[in-house]
UniProtKB/Swiss-Prot annotation:
PROSITE patterns: GST_CTER (PS50405), GST_NTER (PS50404). One of its GO terms (cellular component) is cytoplasm. CDD domains: GST_C_Zeta, GST_N_Zeta. It is an enzyme of class 5 (isomerase). It comes from Ralstonia sp. Residues 1-80 form the GST N-terminal domain. Keywords: Aromatic hydrocarbons catabolism, Isomerase, Plasmid, Pyruvate. The keyword Isomerase applies. Its EC number is 5.2.1.4. Belongs to the GST superfamily. Zeta family. This is Maleylpyruvate isomerase.
Length: 212
């Protein structure tokens, strides 16, 4: 498989984690967003949306990290990223959606570039923007962890799930945008537990060949 991605991209990061947890090997192909390589015709031919990540399976090119991770779960069911029961799966998907639907979309690179170019937002304004929405999402995530009677080392129980694939990259982003994580001890504990696993360490932005 060929993974078209960018080292600092949160969506790329979450997919790298999922691939590593599943033990699925892939060829790393860097698409430099800062150099606008994703806007070139060659990449547009792969992914008309011109976003990373994209996963070339040899038979097709998959886009959109949530859909790709669900595809991986179906194609490579072991180890599972979703619980066996419907209630557990709903909870894990809800946690992932807090990040994937409510936090990340309004804090991704193209939104921030639009704020800079159209409204003249400086770095302080960008950090304030990101901090507002990250904190709102983390408030909910932390509260859900706090009331979960089955909470373990990770977001759900004692094995990594889909939720952790989403959470860890968002914590990385929060630190980059100088968000105060003091109010989120449970999130920080989950992030630390994930950081002990090789699958997460190998997926980290700083560990990628195109990191800068």
């Amino acid at each position: 498989m060929k993974l078209y991605n960018f080292w600092r991209s949160g969506t790329s990061h979450r997919l790298r984690i999922a691939l590593n947890l599943k033990g699925v090997p892939y060829e790393y192909l860097a698409v430099h967003l800062g150099k606008e390589e994703h806007l070139k015709d060659a990449f547009k031919a792969l992914n008309p949306q011109q976003l990373v990540p994209a996963l070339d399976t040899g038979a097709q090119v998959l886009i959109q990290s949530p859909a790709i991770i669900e595809w991986l779960e179906e194609q490579y069911p072991t180890p599972a990223l979703l619980p066996a029961d419907a209630d557990g799966r709903q909870r894990v998907r809800a946690l992932a959606a807090i990040v994937g639907c409510d936090i990340h979309p309004i804090n991704n690179r193209r939104i921030l570039e639009y704020l800079r170019k159209t409204f003249g937002a400086d770095e302080a304004a960008i950090n304030a923007w990101c901090g507002t929405w990250i904190s709102a999402g983390f408030d909910a995530y932390e509260a859900l962890l706090a009331v979960d009677p089955k909470r373990g080392r990770y977001s759900f129980g004692d094995t990594p799930t889909l939720a952790d694939c989403y959470l860890v990259p968002q914590v990385e982003s929060a630190r980059r945008f100088q968000v105060d994580l003091t109010p989120y001890p449970l999130i920080r504990a989950v992030d630390a537990a994930c950081g002990e696993l090789d699958a997460f360490r190998r997926a980290a932005p700083a560990a990628q060949p195109d990191s800068a």
